[in-house]
Amino acid sequence: MNTQSKIWLLLAALLTFLVPATVWAEEADFSGSFEAGVSALSISDSDDVKRVNEYPTIREDDGIQGYGKVKLEAAKGGVAADLDLNYQGGNSRTDIQSQELNLDLNRLIRIHSESETMEHWGDHDTLDYLNATMKGSGTTTNTATDKQPAIASDDLTPEEDFMIIRREMKNEADIALPQLPGVTLHVGYRTEEREGTEQAITLSKCAACHVVGESKQINEKTEDLTAGLTGKFGGLTIEYDYLNRLFEEQAAAPTYRVDVANAPDLPYPTGNFDGRLLYDYPDELAYNETPDSQKQSHSAKVRVDMVNGSELVGSYVYAEAKSDKAGDPDIYSLNVNELTSELNAYGAKFKTRLGKSMILTLSGKVQEIAGDDFTLTYEAVSGANYVQNFSSEETRDELDLKADLLIRLAKGQTVRLGYEYEEIDREHNDLGDTEASIYKLAYNGRLSKALSVRVKYQYEDIEDPFRNHNAANVPLTDVNGSAGTGVVITAASGVDLRYGDAFYDRREDDLTNMPEEVHEAKVSTTWSPSSQFSTTLYARVRQESNDVINNSYEQSVFAPGASMWFATTGGLNLTMAYNFNKEETENKMCVGWYHG
């Protein structure tokens, strides 16, 4: 826990229980509880313990672990306060802890403050599934007949454990103004800090034939300042909220140095490749950089409650995010110092009763997202600079329409019918436009006093999901005849047989792991014969697939489970649960084939 959080919570606690002193000096309702304990843990695992302990609440190795809980409540007249403290020591890198404070001053001022410290284990890709055919000296390999992996890899930190320690503190206050009945002001301040290490992976030298992983320092800080108001005037409610967010990465980005370019290994003659270099840079280059950013947003919401029980809601959100950008001297430059993204979102909802047994809800949302265009200029080694213009691929318009009908069949039994239409219109033609229709059906019923059942089914029909256009499958032609041993690509008429022209520009197939069709069903039943016992059985089944050009993707999920709760007469509660998850995915992928 950082010093700032400690000081804030100490001051808040002093304000709660010492100010105003005249209030707490008199008799007041005061209660509290304290709990502490220790546990000895023996950890046994056959694989990486982080796979089942990503957000650790227990130690990663054998040892003693302690915990403590404190809860205090006090009230007098119109003043009330409560304080919760939770502490767990003995974890791997830091102590897990959380604090929460609530203070109510005559319902005119309400203060809420909380802080939390937690750990997050990061993934470590060993890269040992990547190997090369020509990483060292020796004879060449026939790539047409000996299908070995053709990518080299180096994990520079094979023994390192990557972990992020996250600290968050939130402070919020609601202030009711006696001079303006029905109006409440809201102010808030939030900080989040992430500190530790993550794995950074990059491509080395000239292409993607050499993959390298190393450690990257993380020292991020996010600050949020919020303000707003809520006004209630009879059946009319008006809300406005403002957010100002600053993000800063205080750690330096990892760097790498471009290797000297040499000719292929034996039996070819050794020599330099200076004539084929796109650029030559003698110093270290930064990669995997996280830019600083700023965000501001304004949101307004109006709600009208009608006399017949109907409800009408309208909303508008404007957000602007700026990301700091800079070129790299002697390599490239940008025509702007920051890139800006804008969001305009409009929403509406209408809810009304149809007779005594049906409720109809209609809603819609339109989002307009726009990103900056920019120009990138590469500094020339000789001759003129190379200038490239870019337009933002995130620019798009989104439409979302929903209809929901709730039907009451009998006492304790309802059926819900729903339909949703989604449309995404992207500015880049290569990314395509997506349309989706979603159909929903749900049943919720109490079959008896002790037995209840919930069933839900959803079907999604998606046209042109987001995909990587022309991402794979270069047409190959055997030009050596039956006696040949190699399959090579032939140049089209008028096309130079360079790598980019011959391979990348001639790919034909699209790749995506986004589905075109989804079926999902959920069912659960709860049996509660008494107020001291309850058990629930549940299951989820999901099947999704697509069939784009020369590519197919399928994924199936089966996730059943059961839970049981039992309360003894002595105040002891027992909870047991079992969950099973089986997920199978089949998807074609395009693997780069680089050889020497």
Describe the predicted segments one by one.
Residues 2-10:
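Bacterial N-terminal signal peptides that target proteins for export
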Residues 10-20:
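Bacterial N-terminal signal peptides
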